[in-house]
């Protein structure tokens, strides 16, 4: 083995198996490209991205960990989102992070 080398299993590796998915159309209304990483709470992504933020609440991009999607200015593209897992708490991404996503009292 070489230091830093990846040894992957044979066959197809499924990302987020069995997870519910939603598809949303996103348009970059800004004048420069925007990249969104794999674990960003998608509704808190750059304000220049136009999409249904309410529908995306509690979700992240359905892409491999450590990767990102690039949105070019003026172009529309469809993305697949999956619900955030784990404790479903979001802090520090933007000025008004939602906190506990499943809090019955609403956002904190």
UniProtKB/Swiss-Prot annotation:
One of its GO terms (cellular component) is urease complex. Keywords: Cytoplasm, Hydrolase. One of its GO terms (molecular function) is urease activity. Disulfide bonds: none annotated. Its main location: cytoplasm. GO terms for biological process: urea catabolic process. Pathway: Nitrogen metabolism; urea degradation; CO(2) and NH(3) from urea (urease route): step 1/1. Its EC number is 3.5.1.5. Belongs to the urease beta subunit family. Heterotrimer of UreA (gamma), UreB (beta) and UreC (alpha) subunits. Three heterotrimers associate to form the active enzyme. This is Urease subunit beta. The gene is ureB.
């Amino acid at each position: 083995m070489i230091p830093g080398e990846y040894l992957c299993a044979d066959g197809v590796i499924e990302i987020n198996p069995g997870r519910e998915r939603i598809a949303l159309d996103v348009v970059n209304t800004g004048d420069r490209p925007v990249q969104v990483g794999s674990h960003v709470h998608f509704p808190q992504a750059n304000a220049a991205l136009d999409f249904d933020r309410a529908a995306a609440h509690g979700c992240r991009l359905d892409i491999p960990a450590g990767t990102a999607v690039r949105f070019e200015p003026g172009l529309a593209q469809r993305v697949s989102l999956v619900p955030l897992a784990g404790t479903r708490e979001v802090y520090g991404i933007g000025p008004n992070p939602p906190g506990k996503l499943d809090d019955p009292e609403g956002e904190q």
